[in-house]
From Swiss-Prot:
This is Conotoxin Cap15a. Contains 4 disulfide bonds. Its main location: secreted. The cysteine framework is XV (C-C-CC-C-C-C-C). GO terms for cellular component: extracellular region. It is found in: Secreted. Expressed by the venom duct. It comes from Conus capitaneus (Captain cone). Keywords: Disulfide bond, Pyrrolidone carboxylic acid, Secreted, Signal, Toxin. Belongs to the conotoxin O2 superfamily. It holds the Pfam family Conotoxin.
């Protein structure tokens, strides 16, 4: 009987931890679309302008011409990004 009580207690703790970890992950995923929507709205409000060509500095992927992304290269502590394929 004591073993059964102990197993139920352990199962409850593990289930609680699983639910807490899953809910934290869900909040992180829900936040991402808002970030992308904000960037997209910002780009729309700036209006039509020329895109940044490959190899030139950028702050956001929206600045780069089509088929290019704003990427940081070099060391993990990279401070400048460039439009790259």
């Amino acid at each position: 009987m004591e073993k059964l009580t102990f197993l139920i207690l352990v199962a409850t703790v593990l289930l609680t931890i699983h639910v807490l970890v899953q809910s934290v992950g869900d909040k992180h995923l829900k936040r991402r679309p808002k970030q992308y929507a904000t960037k997209h709205l910002s780009a729309l409000m700036r209006g039509h302008r020329q895109c940044t060509q490959q190899g030139y500095g950028c702050d956001e992927t929206e600045e780069c011409c089509s088929n290019l992304s704003c990427k940081c290269s070099g060391s993990p502590l990279c401070t400048s990004s460039y439009c790259r394929p």
